């Protein structure tokens, strides 16, 4: 398996910095692991019609890491770190506005 480049968008970095210490460490380790395996067993695909990258989420306790995988470029973009509940992926369209359509 090839190694993926992991990019965390600036807004997601800000969210990571605001997390409680224990959660922040778990989130950072999970993000680093995306370089070797961007589709860990506990991650789930998020259905987004007409979008080129595959959008997934990884659950860590009550937190979600929302990210996009572009296999052609071996790239993982971390888009958001959100607490659930109340997060319901309502801003997913805004997070993905810069990605090309199929």
Where are the predicted features?
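Short histidine-centered beta-strand/loop micro-motifs
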Residues: 16-18, 56-59, 68-70
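Arg/Lys-rich, positively charged N-terminal/basic patches that mediate binding to nucleic acids
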Residues: 1-30
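Active-site micro-motifs of SAM-dependent methyltransferase domains
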Residues: 14, 33, 83-86
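Residues that form or immediately flank small-molecule/cofactor binding pockets and catalytic motifs
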Residues: 11, 53, 83
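Residues that recognize and position ribonucleotide moieties
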Residues: 5-6, 56-58, 85
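Enriched for short, Lys/Arg-rich terminal
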Residues: 3, 63, 68-102
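A short, surface-exposed loop/turn module that caps and links secondary-structure elements
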Residues: 32-58
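Non-catalytic, surface-exposed connector residues within folded enzymatic/regulatory domains
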Residues: 25-28, 42, 89-90
